[in-house]
C-alpha cells in the first residue's frame, strides 16, 4: 500500500542520465567536446525526489540503503514514530506505541487539485498499540493521522491549488568544531572547541590567555575543565595519567578547588541553577539529562558520524548511540590541549592516529543539507512531542478499561504542523514557473536562510564567499545579486546528497598514473585527503597521463604540478563545478564571473515565446535540463498507439498501455503560458526515456528560451547608446519575439449581513451594449475580446438599508423585495489590461464543490494577452548583457548584407568590450558558421587548427545546431578556421569574411556601404519578463488618499506621478510661481479648489484662486496634537479659520456637477465612473 502511493515520484527521474548521444530521437547536432565523459548527468530532480522517498520509506530507497551496508533501514516517518514510542504514563503502567506508517491512494489528480484549489495529498495511517502493563492486555488499532501532501513527479507539491517547492537548507552540521583566534591584548593564539548537537545543550571548551582550560555548559559561566572530569567520576590520578603530557592541564588541575566527584557535581549545579539548593542527586540527574539521555540530547546520526570521524573513535563500526559518551568528552579535551600546544597528531586509546588541526566552519565538510524529507520530518517531530504530552495526560484521566488508541490520540498538532510548514515556512516557496529552467533551478536551490540557519543581516563576507570545497558541489557563479548574494546557491550538475546530508561530487580513480573508469563520490573532507587532476589533463588511449608533470589541486584549493603517480583522482567532466543554468552558457570560460552570474540568472527570467527555437550554439546541457524540467518522456519502450493535441498513448512492449495528458494553454504561477505539444506520430517506435512531447520553451526536447537572431555589432545614430537595442520590425510583424501571458481573474458571491450576493446578468444602470459579451449564465463568453473596464462576471450586492421616501415605500409595498436597491460589484478587467477570454471555471455549492465558509459561488476567468515585442521591453543575452529596446526600425531601414539580407538586431560595440564577456563575440561567430554551414578542405591534409576536431566536424550543413560545452568547447583558432570555411549562399558568395566581419549597407535612402566592416553573426536573444506593458501607466483623475487628499501612488492603486521636493526646486529655479502654485493646490490636495476649477472649466469661466491644501490642514492638526496653539494669520494679522471642507458652495457645485465628494481611495478605476 505504501509503494502504491509514492506514485507521484516519477520513475523517469530515476532513470539513468540522458544525453544527446543516448536518447533516440534527440536533435541532430555536432559537438566540439574533446573529452569523453565517463559519467552521464544524473536525474536533476533527485535531490528532491530521493529525499521525499526516504521520508515515506519507499522500497527503492530501502534497497539502496541495504546495498550501502545499512542494517534494517527505516524511512523518515517510521524513524520519528520509533523515537516517540513507547509513550508511558507517569506510573509506567500503560504505554502506547506507533509503527508501520502507510498511505492510501491520493484523493485527486494533480490537475484536479490545481483546478479546485485542493491539496495533492494522501491519507496517512499508522498502527497504534496500547499495552496495559498491569494486566498484559494489548489493544491495536489503525489510526488516521491526517492527509499528507505528496510530491508530484516533477518534485513539487500542490498546496491549496498552488504549486510550491521546498528548498533545501544549507546548515552547520552537528559535530565537534575546533577554532583558533588571536587575543587582542596579548596577541596569543587561543583555541576553543564547541560540541554542537542536533538537539540539546552546547558543550564548549577553551584555553584562555592565562593558559587554563575551561568549560561552558549550556552557555553558562566558565569553570575549570577538571571540574567536569571529576563530575564524570575521574580522580586526580586518572586525570594526571591521561593528561600528564600537558602543562596547561596540570596547571588547571592545581587551580581547581574541588576535591571529588560530589563537590564537582554541586559546583556545576550551582553554575547551571543559581539560587536553587544543590543536592548530589539533583546534580547527577541534571548532568545526565543534559548530555547522556536520548530524550533530552541528540547528536543525530550525522553528529555522531562527525564526532567519530574527527576524534578517531569507533572507526568502521556502525553508528548506534546518539548521545555523548565519557570518551567523547575526554578525547575532545585532549584534542584541544594538543592543538593549543602545537602538536600535529594524537592517538586515541583504540590505537588510531590522526591529524590535529583547527576547522574551517565554512568548509563543506562542516556544512550539510537539510533536504525536503528531513525538513518535514523535523516539523512533525516537534508536533508529535506535543501530542505525547496530551496522550500522557489522557492516560491518567481516562478509565483504563475504556481506553483505546483512538481515544488517546489527538491528530490536530500533526495536521497543523504539516499545514504550517507548507503554508508559512520560509523554505516552502511559491514555485518559480516563469520558464522551465527557472522551475528546475528552484528545485535545486540551496539556501543558508530559514529557521535554524543564517539571517542576511548577520551573515558576514566569509560565509558568502566562494570556498574551495564548493568545487563540484555548489556553483560558484549562480547566486542572487542583492542582499542574499552567497547565501543562496545552486547545486552543481553532477552533485548528489549522501544519507548524512553532505554534498558529494564524482571523481575518476587514478591508479599509478593511469585513469580508470571507476567512479567514486567524495565529500569535501574526503577530497581534502587526495590529490585531484582536472578533467582536461592530457591522457593517451590507455588513460595514462602523457605529461610528466600534471596540474592538480590539493587541500585548501592549492594548485601545483606533481608527477603523474602522485595523482589520486581526476574530475569526471569540465562542467562539474557549475550549475545547470551556468552550464547552458556557451564559451563561459571567456566571460567575466560577474557577467556570467547575470547571464545564469537572466535565463530564468526569459518568457516562453509563441514559437520556441533551440539555440544554434548550445552547450549540450539543453536536452537533459528540458527532460527534467518540462517535457514528457516515455517511461517504457514501445509504440505510439494514439496521438492528439491533448494526450499521447504508448503501448509498451510488455503489453501495458500508458497515457500522457498534455497541458494546453495553462497559466503558470507567473502568468506565462504553459502549453505542451506532441512531437511523435502514431505508429512511431519510442525508447524508454525518449522525449514524446515538447513543453513551453522547448523544441524537439531541447531547452529553447529565446531566438537565434542575425546581429550586427555597431553604433547606429545613437539609438543604441549604452545598452539600448535596435530591432527590426520583422520581429514584430512575424511574431518572432511574441509571448502569450495569461491572467486569472476571480470573484465570489458571499453571504453578507444585508443578504446574499448574486452573480447575474441583470445589473442596474448598465446598457445592453455593455453586457453584450455576457452569456445567459451571467459570465463573459469564451473567445470574447475584452479591454480594461469591461465586465467579465456580473454581480450585484445588496445595499445598506436607509430610511425610505414615501414613494419608495409605495414601490416596496407594490413590488415587494424586487424594488430593493443593489450595488454593482461586477468583476471587471483591471486598468491597463486586455486580451481574449480563453477559459472559465465555475464552482458552486449546488454542485458540491468545496468552497470557503460563507462563499456560495466562485468564478474564475482566464484572459490571454498576446504581447508583441515593443519599445521599452527588455532583452538579454546568455552572457549577462541586458538592454532595453530603444527603437524598432522598418525592415527597409535596417543595415543589410551584400545579398540583401537585413539584420534583425543592432547592438552597441561598448556592450561587448567594456564588460569583459568576449564569449558573446565567439558565440556570434560560431552562430554564423552553424547557420551557413561549413566544409573544411582536408584533401591536402587536416589543417593544424582542425587537428583536435572530431571527424564529424569537418563539415556541417546549413542550419546545424552545435554544442560547445563549458571549458571543453570550440577554441578561438578553430572558430577562425571555420569562418574561413563557411559555405557560400545561393549566389555562390560568402557573406562573412574569415575575421567574422562583413560589409554592411545602409538600408536608408543612400544604400551606401558603411565605411568599415562590421561583426555579423547569429546570437541567442532572450525576451525577459520585464515588459513595458506591465510598467507603463498614466492617470488623469483617480482616487485620493483619505488623510492628505493627495492622489495615491503606483500603478496598482491607479495613482499619479509624484511631484516631489526636487521637482519643486526645479520650478522655483525657473521662477514658475503660478505653475508651482497650481501643482501644489488644485492639481493635488486643494479639495475645494478642485471642484471649483472643474465647475469653471465646465462653465467656461476663469480659473478661480486656489485655496488651502489639505496637507497644510493635516500639518496644523499634527502640531495641535502636540499641544501647540498654532494659528494662521492673514497679511493684516487677523486669524484665518481653517474649515474642514463644509463649504456650502462646494457642496452645491459638486451636486450640480454630479461629483461624489465622499469618494476616497476607490478600489478600481470603474469606481470613478
From Swiss-Prot:
CDD domains (alphabetical): RNA_pol_B_RPB2 (cd00653)
GO CC entries: DNA-directed RNA polymerase complex
Transmembrane stretches, start-end: none
GO terms of molecular function: DNA binding; DNA-directed RNA polymerase activity; ribonucleoside binding
Top-level EC class as recorded in UniProt: transferase
Gene Ontology BP, a term: DNA-templated transcription
E.C. number: 2.7.7.6
Catalysed reactions listed for this entry: RNA(n) + a ribonucleoside 5'-triphosphate = RNA(n+1) + diphosphate
UniProt entry keywords in alphabetical sequence: DNA-directed RNA polymerase, Nucleotidyltransferase, Transcription, Transferase
UniProt keyword Transferase present: yes
Cysteine-cysteine disulfides: none
Family: Belongs to the RNA polymerase beta chain family.
Biological function: DNA-dependent RNA polymerase catalyzes the transcription of DNA into RNA using the four ribonucleoside triphosphates as substrates.
Quaternary assembly: The RNAP catalytic core consists of 2 alpha, 1 beta, 1 beta' and 1 omega subunit. When a sigma factor is associated with the core the holoenzyme is formed, which can initiate transcription.
PANTHER family, sorted: DNA-DIRECTED RNA POLYMERASE I SUBUNIT 2
Protein name: DNA-directed RNA polymerase subunit beta
Species whose genome carries this gene: Mycolicibacterium smegmatis
Amino acid at each position: 500500500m505504501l509503494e502504491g502511493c509514492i506514485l507521484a515520484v516519477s520513475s523517469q527521474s530515476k532513470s539513468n542520465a540522458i544525453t544527446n548521444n543516448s536518447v533516440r530521437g534527440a536533435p541532430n547536432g555536432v559537438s566540439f567536446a574533446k573529452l569523453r565523459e565517463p559519467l552521464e548527468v544524473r536525474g536533476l530532480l533527485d535531490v528532491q525526489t530521493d529525499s521525499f522517498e526516504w521520508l515515506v520509506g519507499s522500497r527503492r530507497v530501502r534497497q539502496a540503503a541495504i546495498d550501502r551496508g545499512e542494517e534494517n533501514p527505516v524511512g523518515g516517518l517510521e524513524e520519528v514514530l520509533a523515537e516517540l514510542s513507547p509513550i508511558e504514563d507517569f506510573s509506567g503502567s500503560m504505554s502506547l506505541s506507533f509503527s508501520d506508517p502507510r498511505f492510501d491512494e491520493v484523493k485527486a489528480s494533480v490537475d484536479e487539485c490545481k483546478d479546485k484549489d485542493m491539496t495533492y495529498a494522501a491519507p496517512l495511517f499508522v498502527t497504534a498499540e496500547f499495552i496495559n502493563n498491569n494486566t498484559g492486555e494489548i489493544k491495536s488499532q489503525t489510526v488516521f493521522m491526517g492527509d499528507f501532501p505528496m510530491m508530484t513527479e516533477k518534485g513539487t507539491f500542490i498546496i491549496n491549488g498552488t504549486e510550491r517547492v521546498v528548498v533545501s537548507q544549507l546548515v552547520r552540521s552537528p559535530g565537534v568544531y575546533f577554532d583558533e583566534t588571536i587575543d587582542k591584548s596579548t596577541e596569543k593564539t587561543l583555541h576553543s572547541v564547541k560540541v554542537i548537537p542536533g538537539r540539546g545543550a552546547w558543550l564548549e571548551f577553551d584555553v584562555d590567555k592565562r593558559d587554563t582550560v575551561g568549560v561552558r555548559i549550556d552557555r553558562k559561566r566558565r569553570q575549570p575543565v577538571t571540574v567536569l572530569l571529576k563530575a564524570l567520576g575521574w580522580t586526580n590520578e586518572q586525570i594526571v595519567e591521561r593528561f600528564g603530557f600537558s602543562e596547561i592541564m596540570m596547571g588547571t588541575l592545581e587551580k581547581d578547588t574541588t576535591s571529588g566527584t560530589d563537590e564537582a557535581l554541586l559546583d556545576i549545579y550551582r553554575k547551571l541553577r543559581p539560587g536553587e539548593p544543590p543536592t548530589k542527586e539533583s546534580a547527577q540527574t541534571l548532568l545526565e539529562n543534559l548530555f547522556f539521555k536520548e530524550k533530552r540530547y541528540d547528536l543525530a546520526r550525522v553528529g555522531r558520524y562527525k564526532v567519530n570521524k574527527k576524534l578517531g573513535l569507533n572507526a568502521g563500526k556502525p553508528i548506534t548511540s546518539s548521545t555523548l559518551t565519557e570518551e567523547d568528552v575526554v578525547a575532545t579535551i585532549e584534542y584541544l590541549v594538543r592543538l593549543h600546544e602545537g602538536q600535529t597528531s594524537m592517538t586515541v586509546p583504540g590505537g588510531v592516529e590522526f591529524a590535529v588541526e583547527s576547522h574551517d566552519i565554512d568548509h563543506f565538510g562542516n556544512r550539510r543539507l537539510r533536504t525536503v524529507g528531513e525538513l518535514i520530518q523535523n516539523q512533525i517531530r516537534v508536533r508529535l512531542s506535543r501530542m505525547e504530552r496530551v496522550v500522557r495526560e489522557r492516560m491518567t484521566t481516562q478509565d483504563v478499561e475504556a481506553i483505546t488508541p483512538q481515544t488517546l490520540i489527538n491528530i490536530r498538532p500533526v495536521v497543523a504542523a504539516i499545514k504550517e510548514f507548507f503554508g508559512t515556512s520560509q523554505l516552502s516557496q511559491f514555485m518559480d514557473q516563469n520558464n522551465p529552467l527557472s522551475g528546475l533551478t528552484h528545485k535545486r536551490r540551496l539556501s543558508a536562510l530559514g529557521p535554524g540557519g543564517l539571517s542576511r543581516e548577520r551573515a558576514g563576507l566569509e560565509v558568502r564567499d566562494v570556498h574551495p570545497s564548493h568545487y563540484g558541489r555548489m556553483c560558484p557563479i549562480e547566486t542572487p545579486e542583492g542582499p542574499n548574494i552567497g547565501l543562496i546557491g545552486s547545486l552543481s550538475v553532477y552533485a548528489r546528497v549522501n544519507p548524512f546530508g553532505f554534498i558529494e561530487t564524482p571523481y575518476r580513480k587514478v591508479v599509478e598514473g593511469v585513469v580508470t573508469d571507476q567512479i567514486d563520490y567524495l565529500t569535501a573532507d574526503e577530497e581534502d585527503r587526495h590529490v585531484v587532476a582536472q578533467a582536461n589533463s592530457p591522457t593517451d588511449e590507455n588513460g595514462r597521463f602523457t605529461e610528466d608533470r600534471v596540474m592538480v589541486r590539493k587541500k585548501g584549493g592549492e594548485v601545483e604540478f606533481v608527477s603523474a603517480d602522485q595523482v589520486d583522482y581526476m574530475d569526471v567532466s569540465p562542467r562539474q563545478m557549475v550549475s545547470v543554468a551556468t552550464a547552458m552558457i556557451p564559451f563561459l570560460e571567456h566571460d567575466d564571473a560577474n557577467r556570467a552570474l547575470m547571464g545564469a540568472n537572466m535565463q530564468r527570467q526569459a518568457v516562453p515565446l509563441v514559437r520556441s527555437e533551440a539555440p544554434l550554439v548550445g552547450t549540450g546541457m539543453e536536452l537533459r535540463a528540458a527532460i527534467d524540467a518540462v517535457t514528457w518522456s516515455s517511461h517504457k519502450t514501445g509504440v505510439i498507439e494514439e496521438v492528439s493535441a491533448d494526450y499521447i498513448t504508448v503501448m509498451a512492449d510488455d503489453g501495458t498501455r500508458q497515457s500522457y495528458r498534455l497541458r494546453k494553454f495553462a497559466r503558470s504561477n507567473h502568468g506565462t503560458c504553459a502549453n505542451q505539444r506532441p512531437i511523435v506520430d502514431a505508429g512511431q517506435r519510442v525508447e524508454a526515456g525518449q522525449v514524446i512531447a515538447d513543453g513551453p520553451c522547448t523544441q524537439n526536447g531541447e531547452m529553447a528560451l529565446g531566438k537565434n537572431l542575425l546581429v550586427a555589432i555597431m553604433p547606429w545614430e545613437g539609438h543604441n547608446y549604452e545598452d539600448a537595442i535596435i530591432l527590426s520590425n520583422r520581429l514584430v510583424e512575424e511574431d518572432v519575439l511574441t509571448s502569450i501571458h495569461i491572467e486569472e481573474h476571480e470573484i465570489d458571491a458571499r453571504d453578507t449581513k444585508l443578504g446574499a450576493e448574486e452573480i447575474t446578468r441583470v445589473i442596474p444602470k448598465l446598457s445592453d451594449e455593455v453586457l453584450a459579451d455576457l452569456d445567459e449564465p451571467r459570465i463573459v463568453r469564451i473567445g470574447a475580446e475584452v479591454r480594461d473596464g469591461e465586465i467579465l462576471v456580473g454581480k450585484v450586492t445588496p445595499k445598506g438599508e436607509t430610511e425610505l421616501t414615501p414613494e419608495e415605500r409605495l414601490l416596496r409595498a407594490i413590488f415587494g423585495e424586487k424594488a430593493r436597491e443593489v450595488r454593482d460589484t461586477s468583476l471587471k478587467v483591471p486598468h491597463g489590461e486586455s486580451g481574449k477570454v480563453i477559459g472559465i471555471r465555475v464552482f458552486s455549492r449546488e454542485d458540491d464543490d468545496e468552497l470557503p465558509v460563507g462563499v456560495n459561488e466562485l468564478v474564475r476567468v482566464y484572459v490571454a494577452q498576446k504581447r508583441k515585442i515593443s519599445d521599452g521591453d527588455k532583452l538579454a543575452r546568455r552572457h549577462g548583457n541586458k538592454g532595453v529596446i530603444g527603437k524598432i526600425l522598418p525592415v527597409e531601414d535596417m543595415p543589410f548584407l551584400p545579398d540583401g539580407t537585413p539584420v534583425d538586431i543592432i547592438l552597441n560595440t561598448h556592450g561587448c568590450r567594456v564588460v569583459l564577456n568576449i564569449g558573446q563575440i565567439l558565440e556570434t561567430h560560431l552562430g554564423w558558421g552553424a547557420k551557413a554551414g561549413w566544409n573544411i578542405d582536408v584533401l591536402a591534409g587536416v589543417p593544424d587548427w582542425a587537428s583536435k576536431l572530431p571527424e564529424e566536424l569537418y563539415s556541417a550543413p546549413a542550419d546545424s545546431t552545435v554544442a560547445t560545452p563549458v571549458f571543453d568547447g570550440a577554441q578561438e583558432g578553430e572558430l577562425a578556421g571555420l569562418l574561413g570555411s563557411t559555405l557560400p549562399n545561393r549566389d555562390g558568395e560568402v557573406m562573412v569574411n574569415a575575421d567574422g566581419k562583413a560589409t554592411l549597407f545602409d538600408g536608408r535612402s543612400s544604400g551606401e556601404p558603411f565605411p568599415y566592416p562590421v561583426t555579423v553573426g547569429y546570437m541567442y536573444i532572450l525576451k525577459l519578463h520585464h515588459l513595458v506593458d506591465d510598467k507603463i501607466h498614466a492617470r488623469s483623475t483617480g482616487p485620493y488618499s483619505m488623510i492628505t487628499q493627495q492622489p495615491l501612488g503606483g500603478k496598482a492603486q491607479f495613482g499619479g506621478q509624484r511631484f516631489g521636493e526636487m521637482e519643486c526646486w526645479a520650478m522655483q529655479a525657473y521662477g514658475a510661481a503660478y505653475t508651482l502654485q497650481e501643482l501644489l493646490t488644485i492639481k493635488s490636495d486643494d479639495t475645494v479648489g478642485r471642484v471649483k476649477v472643474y465647475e469653471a472649466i465646465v462653465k467656461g469661466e476663469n480659473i478661480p484662486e486656489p485655496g488651502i491644501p489639505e496637507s497644510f490642514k493635516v500639518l496644523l492638526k499634527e502640531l495641535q496634537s502636540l499641544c501647540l496653539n498654532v494659528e494662521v494669520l492673514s497679511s493684516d494679522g487677523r486669524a484665518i479659520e481653517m474649515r474642514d471642507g463644509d463649504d456650502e458652495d462646494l457642496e452645491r457645485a459638486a451636486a450640480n456637477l454630479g461629483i461624489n465628494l465622499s469618494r476616497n481611495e476607490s478600489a478600481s478605476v470603474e469606481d470613478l465612473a
